[in-house]
Amino acid sequence: MFLSPGEGPATEGGGLGPGEEAPKKKHRRNRTTFTTYQLHQLERAFEASHYPDVYSREELAAKVHLPEVRVQVWFQNRRAKWRRQERLESGSGAVAAPXLPEAPALPFARPPAMSLPLEPWLGPGPPAVPGLPRLLGPGPGLQASFGPHAFAPTFADGFALEEASLRLLAKEHAQALDRAWPPA
């Protein structure tokens, strides 16, 4: 078997045929380097709200001379860093008691007698309203029938922590709205 020029193992599978172009390398975007001013403005905006809406992001992007998509990605990364820090802070405390974090983890003040279940029906105590069951945690009858270790505290604690985080976000959002639209 004789091969004509242009045929053969080099061109059959991996070579370029007539009219074909070399495959283009995937474009990889360079890492964004933020200026001190940009970082300061982004951090200030993050303090005001961890989840700014698209209009706030566009406004901030114009202010710091960045594309809105870079601001959006910065907020995603900053929220991930914030969650990681929260996890580390909550993990460094005493793990022996399945108690919820105390008020200092939250930036707003709370009377010392109240700790984190913000609503009475969330805590492990008796129901706030007689006749209504608690919404978190098993009742004494269920605990006795399933044994003391049947309900791990991780789900309830994680739920309460998530709720506290959402309450904080709602408060930050309300404060941001108050600053944006002062009462007339």
From Swiss-Prot:
SUPFAM superfamilies reported for this sequence: Homeodomain-like (SSF46689)
DNA-binding annotation, residue ranges on this chain: 27-86
InterPro entries (alphabetical): HD, Homeobox_CS, Homeodomain-like_sf, RAX/RAX2
Region (Disordered): 1-33
Predominant cellular place of this UniProt entry's protein: nucleus
Cellular compartment(s): Nucleus
Biased composition (Low complexity): 1-10
Domain remark from Swiss-Prot or TrEMBL: The Homeobox transactivates the Ret-1 element in the presence of CRX and NRL.
Name of the molecule in the record: Retina and anterior neural fold homeobox protein 2
Species, as recorded: Gorilla gorilla gorilla
Native organism taxonomy: Eukaryota, Metazoa, Chordata, Craniata, Vertebrata
